[in-house]
């Protein structure tokens, strides 16, 4: 069965689910944002294809459905480049250890493992 967590915020709600163990689930990673004025779906994440479906035009995006493709990239290359620079003392990490700990604690609490 899919794993599910609901995170509530002041002005938003996040529903996170993992269907990796679900029979017939898609093998690709995806990310979807549902809002009051439309949706944005990134599926598959690699190579990136973003589909907007908007109730009204917003910025450079027209009303209705449209697809935006992104150039292919190699996952983790930039992450390892940043990590190497941090290990060498050339720059701090973009995400602090406190932020990483907060993410891990949130996931554990959402799974009932607090």
Name the predicted role of every residue range.
Residues 82-114:
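C-terminal helix-rich "cap/oligomerization" subdomain common to oxidoreductases
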Residues 70-77, 94:
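Short, well-ordered coil↔helix boundary/capping segments
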Residues 39-41, 49-53, 67-69:
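Ser/Thr- (and often Asn-) enriched beta-sheet segments in non-cytosolic proteins
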Residues 1-47, 77-91:
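Contiguous beta-strand/loop segments that form the cofactor/metal-binding neighborhood of enzyme cores
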């Amino acid at each position: 069965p899919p794993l599910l967590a609901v995170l509530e915020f002041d002005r938003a709600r996040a529903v996170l689910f993992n269907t990796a163990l679900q029979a017939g689930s898609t093998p690709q990673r995806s990310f979807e944002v549902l809002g009051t004025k439309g949706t944005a779906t990134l599926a598959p994440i690699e190579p990136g294809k973003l589909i907007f479906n908007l109730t009204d035009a917003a910025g450079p995006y027209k009303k209705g459905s449209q697809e935006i493709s992104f150039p292919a990239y190699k996952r983790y290359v930039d992450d390892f480049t940043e990590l190497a620079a941090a290990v060498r003392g050339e720059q701090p990490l973009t995400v602090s250890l406190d932020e990483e700990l907060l993410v891990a604690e949130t996931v554990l609490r959402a799974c009932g493992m607090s």
